Amino acid sequence: RAFRQKHMLRIGVNDIIRDRPLEEITRDISRVADVSLQVALEAAMKTMESRFGTPHAETGEPSRCVILGFGKLGGKELNYSSDIDLMFLYDAEGQTQGQRISVLTNDDFYARLVTEVVRLLSTHTDGGLAYRVDLRLRPEGNRGPLARSLASTLAYYDTLGRTWERQALIKVRPVAGDVKLGEEFLRAIEPFVYRRYLNVAEINEIKALKRRIEHRSGP
């Protein structure tokens, strides 16, 4: 929180006194969020590993995870009061190793990790809160797991992905964690996002989405 307040003050000075371009201001605000997310992820991972051990893939390799940013964060367009839209992704199914008392599947481990990251960022303290976190853009929204494996996430978009989810993925980017895993996801999801052909149902969904946007915008 102190880090965020310090740098938001610096950005505010650049914005108001030095009259820097809007693109530079929103980019700097987004960078502060990226660093804050990385620090929160590392702290949460340390806490979880001390309790449950280190998550591993079924191959025996240590598991990797990445936080993906959507919307204004993904597009490096955050303003001073923006929520941050996030999705948590890990590389493969498996379980924790290193603690005899309690072994967790990677599903359970990363769900707890997400909860801890959100707590660190959004709990009110004497210094306020760092960020309001929104996880609703993840597959299945509030009904879905807090974190998914790469394979499960790709399977969801391939079979159940909606038009609005395709649009949301246009601005997504890795913001913390294993950037290479995030880039692997971006490459794999590209055929879904930039589909060459649309079926009738998808075209109708686009038309319906356009009508909803126009209705909300008013006359």
Regions found by a protein language model. Name each.
Residues 1-219:
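A nucleotide- and high-energy phosphate-metabolite-utilizing enzyme signature
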